[in-house]
Amino acid sequence: MKLKYIAAFAFAVALASCDILDKEPSDSWDSGSAIQTVDDLKYAVNGVYETQTGNVSQFGNYTGDFGLFADMKGSDYKCVGNNNQATEISKYMATATGNLPEAIYYLFYKSIARANKVMEQTKAAGLTGDEVNAYMGELYALRALFHFDLARVYAQLPTVAKSMDDMGIVLATKTLDYTFVPERASLKDTYETILADLDKAIDLMEPIASTHDKNSTTGHMNYWAALALRARVNLYLDDVNVNGTTEHNKLALADAKKIIEEGPYSLYKYADYTSVWAKEFTEESIFEFQTTSQYNPQRNSLGYYTDPTGYAEAAMSDSFVDDFVKNPDYAKDIRVSTGMIKEESDGTKNKAFYTQKYPGRDGQIYVNNAKVFRLSEMYLIAAEAAWKTNDKTAAAKYIDDLRKERIADYVAGSTVSVTIDDILTERRLELNGEGHMAWDMWRNGKSINNPVAKEVKPGAYNAVFPIPRANINTSHGALKQNPGF
């Protein structure tokens, strides 16, 4: 894995106008006046998504190693293969000169830079109307998503940081040139900027019917996806004082509840659960980064990491197998059945239990969409947020509704009370392999027990990645490193 990196925040460069859904790559958008029509805007927006499909870089994106980041750092996954592609994550081997800390940093700021450039060119062109507002809302939501995930990787989580004045990330809310000297904003400013972008995205998209339509917005951040992200962000903030409030759980619950009650999505049925993972844009899917046979991260894809014939660097941990897969108490739970977690090997190599969430499409193991937001997560957000706002009855009902579609012969109403540990266990069962585990535990003040690093407490120095040294050097020390690196 050898990448050539330029200084972060100097990414306001040629902007690809590739429509990842149905067009071949065309000329770069390298002019300040390149976007002149709504069609130009459409293809430029698709160019932002393109950065996360493996076409710009095979490393560090949602459809590859970043999509498994919190799983590999957590308790429930282990590295079996010996290719050492993602051991900076799974074995806590990250350094300031390492490949993945640089790859994720580079790629996410490149994604933000593309979004910024498209927004600025659209405003400069004077484009207006509902279609333009829908695309602009999409861009604000994407920028919020990229900033949020950079904050999760490179800064401590708000609920475990010593203070919201602690270091957040560099915020890129406009196109920046090579003279820009990056400095890290506070955690407070970081999360307020993320929420401001989401509020703007939702305000722009809410009046526009097309942004509420599931079928016409597949592979794009629509109105519901922006709500889903805002719910997730507020859940991470818990009772931290941001935007003048500490009642973020109430806000998270309101957004999740709106999606559950009014959105065009429905929970996977028990009978369908094992078959949905080979499909795109299914009934639960709120937002996916799309891959195709042409646009995917190849051997650094979700499918290749989670297969014994691939890198086999994301198998189920022994503790997960013992706690759930082999535990008779979970024998009727479809999520840990042989249809979802299977013992496999590559001949005599890489024998372990593997998730079946990334089987590939059309016979290609590389081709798996990253399911960034699903309706199941909204039920789990609602349950956790309700529990934390003392509505324990509602919390139990959300878990009960989910279990009804996941456990054979389940009697509706069986779950009458839950603890926070019950909710976190439900998240481990439902969302494993989708990039949540370690962050879920840490933000709730709980340690993880990684198969290699063993106990990693919330707020530990190695819970985050180091800032790439090349970027610190370029800033002449203005960009500060995370402690411990």
Question: What positions do the PLM features span?
Answer:
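Sec-dependent bacterial lipoprotein signal peptides
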Residues: M1-C18
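Membrane-proximal, proline-rich intrinsically disordered regions
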Residues: L3, C18-L68, A256, G310-Y311, ...
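Elongated scaffold/linker segments in the mid-to-C-terminal portions of large proteins
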Residues: K258-A394, G445-F485
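Short coil/turn linking the two alpha-helices of tandem helical-hairpin repeats
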Residues: A151-P158, A209, Y236-T245, N390
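Conserved, well-structured interaction surfaces
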Residues: N84-Y154, A185, K200-P207, K250, ...
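Structural register within alpha-helical repeat arrays
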Residues: M136, R143, L150, R230-R232, ...
